[in-house]
Amino acid sequence: MPNRLIPLANPANRVLQLDAKLLDNEISDMLYRQLSGAFNSNRLPSWLGRIHSNYASELKLLLELLIFKVTVWNKHSSYGLTLQNLVMYDGGVHNKKFRSKQQSELRVTKKILLLSSVLLGYFVKKIQSYVYSFEDYDLETDGEDLSTLERIRLKTIKLLKSQISTLEKAHSVLSLVNFVTFLVSGSFPDLTTRILNIRFKPLVTTQVAFASNPETISYEFQNRQLVWNTLTEFIVFILPALSVPKFTKSLVSSITGTSPKSSQVTDEDLKVFSSLPERVCAICFQNSQNSDSGAQNDISLNDTLVTNPYETTCGHIYCYVCILSKLQIFKEEGKNLPKSDPNKYWHCLRCNEPASWCRVYTGDVEDALRQKAVEEVTEDEDASSEDEEKRDQDSEGAKTVSQSFHHVNGSDYQTASFIEQAELNENEYTDGSEVEIYDAEDEYTDEEVDDDSPGFFVGAL
């Protein structure tokens, strides 16, 4: 049993097979970069650049098909396999009569299946890009104006979007299992070769090539590097399957013996978060508040401003990373919960409404951030206009009172004016002329003097 899994005599060289696969990928990428540079050259017409930008995936598919025709279809070996002195053959032939002939080449059926795998990869990427172009709110089928075909299409897209991630995880797990099996047995480096039962053998057996002679080359460094690469790929495969927040919550609840905290916002927190300005992300503020042990006075609002705003179901704005992480956590934890359970969805910190999706804030970001400032400026302008109107009314009232006083006491007004005129005349004749003041009673003794008339006048001699 151990000898069958790990043969000791002339074991299959795993490093050559992996190097051949890496070389094929590098050659394909290098040719595609050169093709892209040719289409985007300034010496060529601009419509060629538009063709490349609109049909980049199709051009890459044509390049891969051309490489497949020149190498695998014609020579039963890719360019990387040829450099490593390897060739593909059909490992599923059990008839001894045709085994020697069939082991030197691939059958047409296997070539067609390999070609189909190339086309399948293209169509899978196209379907993924099309499905992920729809947001969750675009797939709602509650509208009354939708036709039957439109409802079926949206339901199909929604089903594919929910199952694509599961299929990707299953493919990653199968690839990991196949890779571990390849390290043990030395055959089938990927899933395609295992499904089609395609094996590799030396291309030239009559001469000893440097790359295919295991007796003259020490693979100690390659084997050590292969182990580290395997551990790295294992970590890359296993980390996306682990839900760190869910594992942390379950661990804390099991240690402390307490039930998970409700997703609803308390009344005290709701008062704090609802009073925050619109330009502040409530989730960032909550994280800063928790990290500072509740020292709210030490938290600067400028450090918790909204970055890359996204709008939730209730219409409030949060940071893209903050709201997406919250929705993703509750989406994974609430899979098995009924819709009536309040912990199935994350609740908005500002209004305590459940949020099931988020989308890009399509409005002007500055409008949302300046709305409160504009309202405050408008209130200040209204208050200042009211004060100005009040001052105008006070000044008009004082003017009316002054005019009434002068109208009633006309004699006093005339007397004051007469005295002012006398002072002006006195100042005018101070250049040496004699100024004499006559008493009205001495000059006009025979005339009756009115008591209300002025008692003196000024005359110049």
Swiss-Prot record:
Record membrane topology? Multi-pass membrane protein
The residue ranges for the Cytoplasmic side of the membrane come to 41-51, 140-151, 243-461
Q: What is its EC number?
A: 2.3.2.36
Pathway(s) it belongs to: Protein modification; protein ubiquitination
The top EC class, named as a word, is: transferase
**What are the BP-aspect GO terms?**
peroxisome organization; protein import into peroxisome matrix, receptor recycling; protein ubiquitination
Q: Which pairs of Cys residues are joined through disulfide bonds in the record?
A: none
Residues covered by region (Disordered): 374-408, 440-461
Q: Which UniProt keywords apply?
A: Membrane, Metal-binding, Peroxisome, Peroxisome biogenesis, Protein transport, Transferase, Transmembrane, Transmembrane helix, Transport, Ubl conjugation pathway, Zinc, Zinc-finger
> Residues that bind Zn(2+) 1, according to the entry?
281, 284, 319, 322
Instruction: Look up keyword Lipid biosynthesis and say if it applies.
Output: no
Q: Which Gene3D superfamilies does the record associate with it? A: Zinc/RING finger domain, C3HC4 (zinc finger) (3.30.40.10)
Q: Which family does it belong to?
A: Belongs to the pex2/pex10/pex12 family.
According to its UniProt entry, what is the function of this protein? Answer: E3 ubiquitin-protein ligase component of the peroxisomal translocation complex. The two types of peroxisomal matrix targeting signals, PTS1 and PTS2, are first recognized in the cytosol by their receptors PEX5 and PEX7, respectively, which then carry the cargo to the peroxisomal membrane. The peroxisomal targeting signal (PTS) receptor-cargo complexes interact with peroxisomal membrane protein (PMP) components of the docking complex.
* Official protein name in the record: Peroxisomal biogenesis factor 2
Question: Which classification does the entry list for the species?
Answer: Eukaryota, Fungi, Dikarya, Ascomycota, Saccharomycotina
